[in-house]
Amino acid sequence: MYNYQFICEVCTNPTTIFSHKVGKWDVKAYIAQSPNGKWDYGYLAYYDDGGVVCPVMLQKDDKGLSEEGARVQALKAIDNFVRTMQETNKEDQSCLLDILWEEMQPKLF
């Protein structure tokens, strides 16, 4: 819960845009409008096997992101994190990547 509170402190009204549990994976992506009016994103990606945790990474772009841009970047960040995990169940990892791909399709094309 601390991570979600961190986003709330920095941005107003964070919105969960993606939330899935697959096997030992639990991932969530958020977007929020920062006080300066720009859109930021954050994500939580937990893999419960040995306590591997990726905390919220709130991104700030000086040029700013559109709301849709923040959505795409959040999903890409989770995809990248999941792909780089070495010590995971490959079947669960593949399933989660498929879900992410399906979620990204309408936003990429």
Predicted feature residues:
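Negatively charged, low-complexity tracts enriched in Asp/Glu with abundant Ser/Thr
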Residues: M1-D26, P106-F109
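Mixed-charge, Lys/Arg-enriched low-complexity segments
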Residues: N3-Y4, G50-F109
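Short aromatic-glycine-(Arg/Gly/Cys) micro-motifs in beta-strand/loop hairpins
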Residues: A32-M57
